Amino acid sequence: MSPAAALTNGSVRQPDLHLVTDDDFVYEQDIQRSPGSTKPWLAYISYKIQHGTVEEQAFVLERACMQLPRSYKLWKMYLTFRTKHIAKLNAAIFAAEYRKVNSLFERALILLNKMPRIWEMYLKFLMKQPLVTLTRRTFDRALRALPITQHNRIWALYRPFANSAAGPTAVKIWRRYMQVHPEDAEDFIELLYQVGYYTEAAKKYIDVLNNPRFTSKHGKGHFELWSEMVELLVEHATEVEAGYETGIDVERIIRSGIERFADQRGKLWVGLATYWIRRGSFERARDVFEEGITTVMTVRDFTLVFDSYAEFEESVIGAMMEVAGQRAEKGVVDEAADFDLDIRMMRFEHLMDRRPFLLNDVLLRQNPNNVNEWEKRVALWGDNHNEVVNTYTNAIAAVQPKKASGPFHQLWANYAKFYERGGDLRSARIIMEKAVKVPFKSVVELADMWIEWAEMELRNDNFEEAVRIMAKAVQAPKRSTVDYFDETLTPQQRVHKSWKLWSFYVDLVESVGTLEDTKKVYERIFELRIATPQTVVNYANLLEEHKYYEESFKIYERGLDLFSYPVAFELWNMYLTKAVDRKISIERLRDLFEQAVEGCPPKFAKIIYLMYGNLEEERGLARHAMRIYERATRAVSDEDRADMFNFYITKSASNFGLPSTRQIYERAIAALPDDEARDMCLKFADMEKRLGEIDRARAIYGHASQFCDPRTTPAFWTKWEQFEVQHGNEDTFKEMLRIKRAVQAKYNTDVNFIASQALARSQQQKQANGHGSGAEDGDDGVVDAMEALERQARAPAGFVAATEGNIKGDAATTNTTVAANPDAIDIDDMED
């Protein structure tokens, strides 16, 4: 064996021949025959792993690596064997054993320094040992030895080692790592933050934010990273080296965010002020707070900045008061410090007094066209004359009439009223004169402005001036073709057609002017075709009050030419009432009523016909009135026709007796729907009964029975039965029953009536249950609709040949009738 082979674990000693047994002879011969081949060594090692001791395995592996030092496979097997052997030993206690393995790795790396797996094994092994410097240097050697394409394998171990080492060592390692992997900058920043390298962390944030290609592996956006940087700068204001040398301008950074991130302005203003507070620059912090509360655009941001400002002032005052208290205890007098405290307290009180104004400023910055907020600002100044005038002046200059939010004309009016209350009517008029020239958003606002001006003159008893102002307001060409709703024209061009303006004008002239002046105004309204029904009524009433009745009637007629129904109905109603009250000639009144009913919709005809008929009854002939009522029954709507027939019948009976109503009843029964015709038949029959015409009444009952289903209208049949009991005989009663069965059979064959029958019976059941114990006998006669139909199908044939009657059902009905009328004749006994 060569001297080199005698090396074991890096030292020279005698060969361990006792580790070679007779069984190893074959393997030793193979090695001698092929000294440069790894195959016999691998076979030898495999045999020893299965049958040899640990010392024998180490002996063979050591010889193999000495014999073939460039064999990666042999070295890996040997190193794995040695590291596994001491894996469970404490690295601090058995440091010597670990150093032996370290020496093996160093020997292996002499020729295998391009093998990343050997480096990884060595580095992992070193990381188990308390050898930070050696481990760091070995990592560096690995990075220098391996090509850059394999550096990731080393960095995967180097980064956890750096984090565990912490401190400056970790920072230096990460700086090198950032050169090849800038995408992990967030982890580096976190490390810098942990070790207190705040300035470098801020610089790294700036580098990241300035790199448009940077993508956060944690999914953070640009704003989130920027916010983290600002938070770092503010929280560690005294530890971050800001200035030209470091390239970190904190105020510029935060102000750029204030301009860029509108929804975060309040938070950023507070952050900037906090930065200066922590650096001890209280005056600069106060300047920042002042700038913040005067520039923020939302109430939320204002509240945030203002509350922080107030808290800052309170803390400063509190600290100064504490120092002042300590001075007082010691008996020390410091007038300058006390004066400074007084100044700060006055400043704080002034700040709190300014809060409503500052808040109002915020709302006006949001929308300078908000009229209501300008009014609130005026109210805040109270009796401060100069500030109120300045506020009104600023408001008028700031508000754009077309974009005004709220009644802009009211702002002008209140401005004028302010001078009016101060007795300066001349200035108020100047304001009003300017106001009516403003291009308001709508004609209504301009009209209100003119009216406000006139009302101001009226309040100061300048009636003629008020009339002159309104005349100027409504001034227009003789034949104006302007469309009131044409938005392309200015309000000043359309205001002369404002009904609100004319209404005020006519009321004003009517109260302070003559009748002729008022008539001219009304006529002008009609010329401009802006009259309303109220205008017509007011004009007519005005003429009537001055005894110009005929002219009043003409006004109604002009109004009727302008308006159609339903407005015309109200005008006709008033016109006809006035005409009748004036007792003009009957012929003229008839002509008016004929005009009124001509083309009148059925919905409105009833009232006019009743008035017409009443006129004929009072001043004409009764026959004429009856003809009018007869026309009314045809002209009115279906809802009013039954009432009209009833009224007609009543009037005919009172004027010409009951017999004269027969034709009316017949027409009503023919014209009305079944439900109303049934009621009309009952009234007709009662009338004939009062006249003693029993047969005619019976015939009417028979006629009405065709649209009276016994199940849904039992009241009709009950009334007919009572009639027959009182005025009939056995034959007539049987005929009534026959008709009843025939009608019931007819309705039973019609599927459309089954549902209505069921509904009627359920209602009867509810009514019977509602009557309590006294209605129990009646409950037996009330049955389910479908059960009744089945019973009818099982019933024997009746005595009416043409139909099949429901005998049992009729018997039940008859029994119910007997229970209700004890005097009725028992037909069943007669038949027996």
UniProtKB/Swiss-Prot annotation:
Organism name: Pyricularia oryzae (strain 70-15 / ATCC MYA-4617 / FGSC 8958)
Matching SUPFAM superfamilies, A to Z?
TPR-like (SSF48452)
Q: Which GO terms describe its biological process?
A: generation of catalytic spliceosome for first transesterification step
The cellular location(s) given in this protein's UniProt record come to:
Nucleus
State the superkingdom.
Eukaryota
What is this protein's record name?
Answer: Pre-mRNA-splicing factor SYF1
Q: Record's Pfam families?
A: HAT_Syf1_CNRKL1_C, HAT_Syf1_CNRKL1_N, HAT_Syf1_M
Function description: Involved in pre-mRNA splicing and cell cycle progression.
Q: Where are the HAT repeats?
A: 18-50, 52-84, 96-128, 130-164, 196-235, 245-278, 280-315, 383-421, 423-459, 476-508, 513-545, 547-581, 584-618, 656-690, 692-726
Q: Which family does it belong to?
A: Belongs to the crooked-neck family.
| GO CC terms, sorted | post-mRNA release spliceosomal complex; Prp19 complex; U2-type catalytic step 2 spliceosome
Assembly state and interactors? Associated with the spliceosome.
Alphabetical UniProt keywords: mRNA processing, mRNA splicing, Nucleus, Repeat, Spliceosome
